[in-house]
């Protein structure tokens, strides 16, 4: 199945090449989940336990709400307009002041109607050459399968070093898809620093489990 999110750095096109390379394992962990394309594309029977993690609390809240409160989430969209004014209203809201469901609705709306699914500084965009990215009449249909797929998935919100430490065991497989070198700030300020590449390398050099990392091929890496 497909991910329900358009998200910067998503692996929609590379998933078919990555998944066959995943070794046998018991526990599957996506450390930088983003749109979680590998999770959604792979056969869930490959793993006895599945965990997705992301440092972005808005994103994690969206996953948790779609998993646990889909009906309430969908209900909100009955009163929402697809318009620039509505986009700007959502954009100006403080996520911390909202309920989890409101926060998830806000983030999903901004992702769907924002230019290039930007996390940092989203701007309103309408495609003139394709169908609307957010069809209010089909949200329930589109998200029902996602709701079922997430039913057995643990959803975490930790720093990558804490995730690697918590779940590292010989039978764990980590899929690691950090921000690409040179794009560290695309996902927000203070989320990932250039020094994190070296820290990540040092941690991965000493784990018990196995991993695949997606990263751009540049001399610095």
Where are these regions (language model features)?
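SAM cofactor-binding core of SAM-dependent methyltransferases
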Residues: 20-94
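SAM-dependent nucleic-acid methyltransferase catalytic core
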Residues: 1-14, 21-22, 67-189, 199-202, ...
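Short, polar loop motifs at secondary-structure junctions
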Residues: 33-37, 142-143, 215-219
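Alpha-helix N-cap and loop-to-helix initiation/capping positions
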Residues: 191-195
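Conserved beta-strand signature within the Rossmann-like core of class I S-adenosyl-L-methionine
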Residues: 209-214
């Amino acid at each position: 199945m497909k991910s329900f999110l358009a998200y910067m750095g998503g692996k929609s096109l590379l998933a078919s090449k990555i998944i066959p390379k995943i070794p046998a394992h018991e526990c599957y962990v996506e450390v930088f989940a983003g749109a979680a394309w590998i999770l959604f594309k792979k056969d869930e029977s490959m793993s006895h336990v599945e965990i997705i993690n992301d440092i972005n609390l808005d994103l994690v809240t969206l996953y948790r709400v779609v998993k646990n409160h889909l009906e309430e989430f969908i209900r909100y969209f009955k009163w929402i307009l697809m318009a620039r004014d509505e986009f700007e209203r959502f954009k100006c809201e403080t996520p911390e002041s909202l309920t989890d469901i409101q926060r998830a609705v806000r983030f999903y709306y901004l992702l769907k109607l924002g230019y290039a699914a930007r996390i940092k500084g989203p701007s309103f965009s309408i495609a003139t050459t394709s169908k609307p990215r957010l069809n209010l009449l089909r949200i329930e249909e589109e998200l029902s399968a996602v709701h079922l797929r997430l039913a057995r998935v643990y959803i975490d919100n930790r720093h990558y070093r804490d995730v690697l430490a918590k779940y590292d065991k010989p039978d764990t497989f980590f899929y690691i898809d950090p921000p690409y070198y040179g794009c560290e700030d695309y996902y927000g300020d203070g989320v990932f620093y250039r020094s994190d590449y070296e820290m990540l390398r040092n941690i991965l050099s000493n784990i018990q489990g196995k991993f695949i990392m997606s990263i751009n091929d540049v001399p610095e890496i």
